[in-house]
Amino acid sequence: MTIHDKEKDKEKKDKKEGTLRLLTSGEIALAKSVFRSTIPYHKVWIHFDSYLPFGLQDQYTAMAPNGEIYFREHYREDYSHTVPFYQHMFIHEMAHVWQREKGLNVIGRSLVSWAVSYHYVLDSRYLSEYPMEQQAQIIADHFILNAEGYTKWCDLRDQDVITLDGNISEPIIRQLYQNTLRGFPW
């Protein structure tokens, strides 16, 4: 954790749950690097709160069931100025916002997302042929590979943040991601 992230942690601790904000300009730029102009960024709210009533959302779980993102313990003031772990989480949740924009029933599918595997194997399928959570993981994992490089990608895979299974040699995974993400974002 960098000094910058320690300052952000202090900043977060000074905030109270129940607050919300729009995306920062840095977060919009970060998300546009992945989703281009396929999301109405000016409508996306970031909540420092539980989506579920009575605070039932787990402290360490982020959710984006309604086109808005709900963080609790992992809330940050600006995900564009955080470590790769938090940027991965942010892009994963933005993938759910994108899925909702494309007509996927994110609320219905999110009710069982706690029970599904985030692990995936890249094969000849298109992104659209993977389940909802695996789609979000593929998008976020690929983002880290491109933004941070193969070494950081491997570090996060060792921490089970990156969830690709199978052969992970760099040239192979780059080609597999390219094949899976062909046409993305549509």
Q: Which sequence ranges carry the predicted segments?
A:
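Active-site recognition of the HExxH zinc-binding catalytic motif
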Residues: 88-100
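Metalloprotease/metallohydrolase-associated module, dominated by Zn2+-dependent proteases
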Residues: 12-15, 23-33, 39, 104-186
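Short, solvent-exposed loop/turn segments at secondary-structure junctions
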Residues: 49-53, 69, 75-77, 95, ...
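Alpha-helical membrane-targeting segments
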Residues: 1, 51-60, 64-66, 102-123
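Auxiliary, metal-adjacent structural segments of Zn-dependent hydrolase domains
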Residues: 15-66
